[in-house]
Amino acid sequence: MEALVYTFLLVSTLGIIFFAIFFREPPKVPTKK
């Protein structure tokens, strides 16, 4: 059961880091439409 807990912690940590980097990006990105 410890493996499940470690997997959950790993996924949650990666998710937090991903969202932190994603939301830290400036929204004023030159979009070419």
From Swiss-Prot:
The chain crosses the membrane at residues 3-23. GO terms for biological process: photosynthesis. It is a single-pass membrane protein. It is found in: Plastid, Chloroplast thylakoid membrane. Keywords: Chloroplast, Membrane, Photosynthesis, Photosystem II, Plastid, Thylakoid, Transmembrane, Transmembrane helix. It comes from the Eukaryota. GO terms for cellular component: chloroplast thylakoid membrane; photosystem II reaction center. InterPro entries: PSII_PsbT, PSII_PsbT_sf. Signal peptide: none annotated. It holds the Pfam family PsbT. Found at the monomer-monomer interface of the photosystem II (PS II) dimer, plays a role in assembly and dimerization of PSII. PSII is a light-driven water plastoquinone oxidoreductase, using light energy to abstract electrons from H(2)O, generating a proton gradient subsequently used for ATP formation. Belongs to the PsbT family. PSII is composed of 1 copy each of membrane proteins PsbA, PsbB, PsbC, PsbD, PsbE, PsbF, PsbH, PsbI, PsbJ, PsbK, PsbL, PsbM, PsbT, PsbY, PsbZ, Psb30/Ycf12, at least 3 peripheral proteins of the oxygen-evolving complex and a large number of cofactors. It forms dimeric complexes. This is Photosystem II reaction center protein T. The lineage of its organism: Eukaryota, Viridiplantae, Streptophyta, Embryophyta, Tracheophyta.
